[in-house]
């Protein structure tokens, strides 16, 4: 069963031998700045065969070396939100996020998130500070959201509906876009209004 009816898909990691990991490269890699803190969160649960285990959460550089590390514990067959803070030990241009259970079993993960603590106006899950500040410095009289192809989609079933972009992140209805990738809608109407 999914975490929410609007969000029916989640990752299943069947660990038969310790060492298996779920990794995400981000969009062209995750940029890390030495000394900065990054908030990790995800929803996780055990499948029926699971016994529970610590999960090592780490950020890896291009060579696979750990540059930040924390751990969370998956111990329930119900969805639970897990959180950790990772501190980058060095600058990395194209890091990847890795989730590695310390025990065998089947793990379910959803809404895996990594955000810098240094966001525009310090908002949790906020906008990238440098980009948002550059836009704010222009003092625009209006901003369009959603814009372009996101607004009209590729048909009636894919038109942007603002109601799917508000509320708890895990309850927001994901949307595929014309560029061929998936949007969680973590940046929805509420976040855009906050920015404005």
Q: In which residue ranges do the predicted regions lie?
A:
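A structural motif corresponding to the C-terminal end of an alpha-helix
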Residues: 189-196
